[in-house]
Amino acid sequence: MQFVRTVKKTPVTLLALSIGLALQAQAFSVLAQDADEPQTEQAAQAAQASSNDSGSLGTVTVTGYRASLEKAVDIKRSEAGIVDAIVAEDIADFPDLNLAESLQRIPGVSITREGGEGRNISVRGLGPQFTRVRINGMETISTTGGTDTSGGVNRGRGFDFNTFASELFSQLVVRKTSSADVPEGSLGATVDLRTARPFDFDGFTLAIGGQLGYSDLASETNPRGTFLISNTFADNKLGALLSVAYTDRTVLEEGSDTVRWSAASANGGFSPASTFAVPGTAYHPRIPRYNRYLHEQERLGVTASVQFRPSARTELVFDGLFSRFDANRWQDNINAVAFSASGATGKPGIIVRDGEVDSTGSLVYGVFDNVRIRSEGRYDEQTSEFDQWSWSLRHDFSDALRLNAFVGSAKSVYDNPVQTTVIADKLGVNGYSYDYRGDRRLPTLSYGNMNPSDPSGWTLAEIRLRPYKVTNEFDNVTLDLAWTASPYFTLKGGADYKDFDYQVQNWGRGTPGGNRVETVPAGLVSSAELAQLMRQYNISAGGAGTAVVPDVAAFARALGIHDGSGIFTVHSNLNNLAADNRQVNEEVKGYFVQGDFNFDVGSILVRGNVGVRRVETTLTSDGWSIIGGVPVATRVVNEYSDTLPSFNLAAEISPDVVLRLAAAEVMTRPDLGFLNPGASVSVAGSARTVTTGNPRLDPFRAKTLDLGVEWYFGDGGILSFGAFYKDIDSYIQTSRETRPYSTSGLPESLIAGTGATVNDEFTFQQPLNTPGGKLKGYEIAYQQPFTFLPGFWRDFGVQLNYTWVDSDIQYLSSTGAPTAKGPMIGLSKNAWNATLYYDNQKFSARVSAAHRSDYANQIPGRESTDMEGTAATTTVDASLSYNFNERFSISLEGLNLTDEWNDMWIDSGRDLPIAYTHTGRQYMLGFRYKF
């Protein structure tokens, strides 16, 4: 089946597409870079209607891949606000591993990866917590886990896109400006994801697709499959659809890490018997090591949809979505843990025999005696399960009055029932050395008189059991009316209600009423028995070679560590664990009124909207505070409200040029990790400290301004420029400050029995509202098919976009004092995407590159550094497809062809490595068939 573009003879066109398996893979990959989609279902219906009515209109027919690009251009032109989109009409034709991989093609969107695939997005320099995601019109959160260096479990408001198979979705919309009829919560963007529906297709549709993937680093093959069946009944008044997507994936990730760098004077300093003097201010790696992660992932997604349209005036839609993402992970490493520890087996016992301190004051080379070496084996079983259902109703009482109603519920559960780490130590190793001089990212590690592949001589040190669970639940109800007062003005108004629950639970070994315990009794296993419970692993990165690590599965069988009995019983109410167990409920009531306008001023067509949204939030946060070593239940209730005006205007000053202006006041609620009411109180003599979350935080609040100009030329060509500015009035940071307890808002019961009073001064470490700062930037996008060239060359085309963002945020030091301004966390100053494609009716090819510059992960950094960050990345993907006929096609795709490494660092002056890992290249050979 071919793409068909039907151009009505009107000033602004909505093009109709019929997207088939033969070409859609190519269409999606480029649409993702610079496409826009109407924000309303009515716009999508209008596009479908234009296709159905094309026989009665004067038309110009364009087939193939270019039709999809021209549709994207027309949609961008017709919108009042600033949006970009990816549109599909068949499940089997989504080319990227997941949704984040496709969204990164859109101007201003950058991604972070986990296990070699996209996990989170940032929009215009604003991180995942500033972007709201809706699925089929309903706000939701999806949560997965990750390695410790990549941030671990998502405990915040950010959306993890790797939960879902990309083939489940037919439309992705990134809305960069605000309007009153779109619920609040975003400083960056609102992303709408829509699954396929039966009326998207013409009658009976059955499509299947399959791929066989290969990961070159893991040397593993991985299957991937899709299935869709859809039909309409009762003279096209009723439709039903079912789709299924499945992926099995094995990825190997390996490289070096340091768990940060610290000063030589920390943890008691090196042994005074050292023969090489290390300055106390010199920085050294805390835990130098090579890591190996084996990710085994299985992803299943199912969507179901029923549409009932008894007349042109009424439509009822049911959407259901289920997804399960199983991600089991093995982590193996051998390391010099002594550099991060105190005591006789820690740094004070290490004798420095030789070393080199470079010009940045870093101990980049050293030879050491009496070093404690650690071998760690960790295994995680992780499941992210998501289910959602919703009903939506549209009814036109007349040509002038429309009702829209929506009710839905969604639940996301991340469950990590097995997080087990088995640790063995070997003491007194002499001649250990590390060398970062030749390669600062892939050092040379030598273990002196110890053979790292010898299983004998180890001592069992710890068995860590840390199950974890995060649950997010949303219930939504919305109702709104739209009255078309004239051809030039429509008045909208409505109300919505949202109930959101968030819960974190974690467990550990120990006795209720006591603390978490991770050590094991001496003699639990003998040295000989331990040797039988070790296994070998190999790391190719940096020539690390072979070493032994505790075999978690063997330990589980031998000791019953997962049986939940004896010393391996886990509890959630341990004194040093309970404060991290928490629950948050948000009850949100919203109201809006908005006017949509569309009129001519002389020869200029002016359209847009102006409105205001009022939102009232009631927050109830429950947790545990540790008082005198005993967990005490704590509850904090907070209420706040916001009035958010918005304005969007598009002026067509000529047939080919559109000017845009948008302004709004916006807000993002505090990240969920900040809202823990739990507090740990310590009173020791005159030292009084409180460590706590802060449920009384105000939201992030900002004023935004957008300006843009777009020039449309040729067949589907566009050159656009957009500038944006955000004045962030209220920001949130964690700080330390000293003030009376009475000013904290915490209950007096927390300090009962400590001897302190509410008038005493305490040192508080908690999140606080801070002044914020400014964010500004611009986007440039260029798209053009080369139809003006002769012969073979006319089938080529290009898409390019570039985004520049800058920010000045006032940060606080670890003592609460203001420091110099710095960039916003997660902000890449420069980002660009480029795609060169070739497309005709038989053959399609593309190569795409996505770049983001370095960005900060934490300001100030740990270990008394200025910041921590991630280095720039540039990923390159390519694909080929061949259409045998309108039903059957084959494809070949290559992802991360340059094998880009993930490079995290600490201290901007020293540029010291934290983690440096890669996952290799991936190739996929696939087919698509439509019956």
Regions inferred by a protein language model and the residue ranges of each:
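Structural signature of Gram-negative outer-membrane beta-barrels, strongest in the C-terminal barrel
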Residues: 307-311, 319, 396-400, 408-410, ...
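Extracytoplasmic beta-strand/coil segments of soluble accessory domains associated
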Residues: 100-147, 176
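Outer-membrane beta-barrel signature, preferentially recognizing the C-terminal barrel domain
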Residues: 378, 384-386, 580-586, 667-728, ...
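N-terminal periplasmic "start-of-domain" segments of outer-membrane beta-barrel proteins
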Residues: 59-94, 120, 143, 147-152
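C-terminal beta-signal and adjacent terminal beta-strands/loops
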Residues: 727-729, 850-860, 881-931
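Gram-negative outer-membrane beta-barrel transporters
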Residues: 725-727, 744-859, 898
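Short loop/turn motifs that connect adjacent beta-strands in outer-membrane beta-barrel proteins
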Residues: 164, 182-183, 198-204, 234-238, ...
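Outer-membrane beta-barrel translocator/receptor signature
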Residues: 151-159, 167-174, 181-275, 286, ...
